[in-house]
Amino acid sequence: MGRRAAAQPATETTATRAAAVTVTTPPPTGRRRRALATAACTTVLLTGAAALTVPASAAPEPSAESTVEAVAAAPAQVAAACGEGSYQAEAVLNGSTWTARRGSSVTYTGTDMRAAIQAAVNSLTAGRTSKERVVVRGSGSISAGSRVSLPSYTVLDVCGTINVTGTGSGDQAPVYSRGTRDIEVQHLNLTGTPLYGVFLRNVQNVVLGELDMRLSRGLGVRIDNRGDTSQWTRNVRIGNVYVSGASSHAVETYGVDGLTVGTVTARNVGESGLLLNQTINATVTKVDADGAGVGTGYAAFRMANRNGRVGSSYPTNIRVGEVIARGGGRGVFCVSESGGAVIDRINLTNTGNNAILIENCYNVNLAAQSGTVSGGGEIRLAARSEFPNNRDITVQNLTVTNSSLRESPCGENTTFRNNRLVNSTQSIC
């Protein structure tokens, strides 16, 4: 059976051991195995102007199986090629001239890509209650100090590349929306120096499809509720996001209830690959980070600021299929009263800081299916004095090579089981 460490004094810490330790535990039940497999294979991507989503509920405690099965049951659609299908307005580049039109009506002609896209968006039906779509055909530049603002019930499909130039301040982004609902970005390619690639605040029913951001500054995708923290941003679906070169995070959320993410791929970003702050009811298929947060305490996957806390408790509501980290800062980092999380598979190699750091977190299950940690910083269960200590942490199914596993101080109801140490040490309670 696994070794359980209840709230024991630090003096009862076991002696450090370097030998391989393997404990066999029963396999998951058939139902659990099927649910986990289904979740790992499901990536939800909604496309098309008529694809509407349903607001998340007020965060009732889900069961392990029901949440995964509900996500798996969501309609998965194959993403159409950029620009295909019907649309209501378009912005088209011909030579050096942009033209925005709706039907036979021309709403803009000139050399300004941002103005053309905004004119196309503004030509959509006023006061609409169903989605209308704008297609952008062509590549161009937008200033970092400006934005394309999307009102409610708007679909944007960018078939080309937006290069963000110069500097700016505040919450400027090539794609921006605030206080809206039913926003969709089907395709988006970005380069350059944005403050944010996509900035969404206090929104509901958001779909982000295929996003590719090859940046030299800024933050990739930021979705939050910081305009009115009394209201959750609700029901956000992200297909696949690739971000390289950002000086901050690839993807960050804050104050979101109801999040579904396919894959976040982060390459040489300055901080985290995926950072979830105060986000509940989230399902993530994969985080794949290489060189995320070099020289920092950020991580390929980070949870902070009471992430996963529903009311005053931590039911399992954050589900991650796989976290991959190569180099960078940390691999997995849970901090500041976060929890309610299960990470099925972990693959961490040569992280510059802790491979895993769990600090003042509650109900976190690491490597529920399998995991490897090779080289890099230690696996550490720690605590700061300003928050209650770790509670209900499970570390299991890990093969740890050329590293160490350490718990200090002793947490409450910590479980270590089925971990194999290869040329590694262990000091746990």
Range-by-range predicted roles:
Residues 2-60:
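Secretory targeting and sorting signals
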Residues 70-119:
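Right-handed parallel beta-helix/beta-solenoid
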Residues 121-131:
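Beta-strand repeat architectures
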Residues 130-172, 190-194:
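N-terminal extracellular ligand-recognition/capping segment immediately after the signal peptide
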Residues 224-231, 295, 301-314, 385-387:
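Intrinsically disordered, low-complexity Ser/Thr- and acidic-rich flexible linkers and loops
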